[in-house]
Amino acid sequence: MVGVTSISSPAISADERSHEVDHPSSLVAHFGADQPLPLDCGIDLTPFQIAYQTYGELNADRSNAILICHALTGDQHVANVHPVTGKPGWWETLVGAGRPLDPSQYFIICANVIGGCMGSTGPASINPATGKVWGLDFPVITIPDMVRAQAMLIDRLGIDTLFAVVGGSMGGMQVLQWTAAYPERVYSALAIACSTRHSAQNIAFHELGRQAVMADPDWHNGGYADRGIHPHRGLAVARMAAHITYLSDAALHRKFGRRMQDRDLPTFSFDADFQVESYLRYQGSSFVERFDANSYLYLTRAMDYFDIAGDHGGVLAKAFAGIKTRFCVVSFTSDWLFPTSESRALVHALNASSARVSFAEIETDRGHDAFLLDVPEFFDIARAFLESAGKARGLNGRGG
């Protein structure tokens, strides 16, 4: 069982330690008016807080820290029982004793992103200026904003250089942003099932989900919290539509085919006759119990805005010019949300910038979500990459 472990650091005050119970099972770092978060939209967010989890212990020279960046609907509960759902952590396949990210060797950190809804400041938080829930008054945030906030947390923890930054999907975008914005602070980077910019198709899928949320009569232009209601129907539809993109035709056929749900014949109604219908309805209904609808709008928009070459004249290689970080880029053959062609474009740009990079395309029919599932080849690649990076840094055997 992986435990949640805090660290002793003079940068974290006793008063802040007293606030660790602000959110179930999470540590919370508070940043006051003297430490505003500058956002890309031109607004300084202050005050704000970041909810996070840690696993393992930071070694004496603070060289074994790994930051995990979560995906769109993830959170900081990587390898512990989720306080809302009661389910195992979302990446227990990768994080744990004997696994590629082993807390006995590494100090592992995962923070709920700014704009999220599991303890970090977001649209579901209280606006200190009004005493009410932010709602749509919350400023629009970007992937660089998320990473900027994470860097402030890493500073607070007294860590100069991260041994590795790891993430898939939206988490992979954060990994790339970390290496572009703070290249001297990232020794190695594992970017999984992601892209350097969101495609037109993916923006379209996100707009579909946002429109489903906003069409729900209970949304009230984002002001549902003040009315004590939630746009669960719209958010459930958004989740159902998005979840399809995380799968593959082959996986859906293998798992469900055209099999009926608890019946032999069609009902000639609009009930969930097919197993795949029942599965999607479950995905939608379970999601709304743990996620905020406005956060969904904000985080999908942040992904849409992501274009790491945008500040470099559209030349991707310039974003990584002179970088010393070791990269491992991973894609999956059946991922049509972030296809391998996008990972190859990233690898070509890294090669053009003379970065040290390895690339793996893994054969699987499990779609985009393969990085969250039991795919042994992926685990082997992640383990080998981290062990190689650890050996190069003289880290192996010195964790904890």
UniProtKB/Swiss-Prot annotation:
One biological process term in Gene Ontology: methionine biosynthetic process
Domain AB hydrolase-1: 64-373
Stated role: Transfers an acetyl group from acetyl-CoA to L-homoserine, forming acetyl-L-homoserine.
Protein name according to UniProt: Homoserine O-acetyltransferase
Record text on subunit structure and interactions: Homodimer.
Source organism of this protein record: Bradyrhizobium diazoefficiens (strain JCM 10833 / BCRC 13528 / IAM 13628 / NBRC 14792 / USDA 110)
Keyword Chloroplast carried by entry: no
Gene: metXA
Active site: 169 (nucleophile), 335, 368
Keywords: Acyltransferase, Amino-acid biosynthesis, Cytoplasm, Methionine biosynthesis, Transferase
Family affiliation: Belongs to the AB hydrolase superfamily. MetX family.
GO cellular component entries: cytoplasm
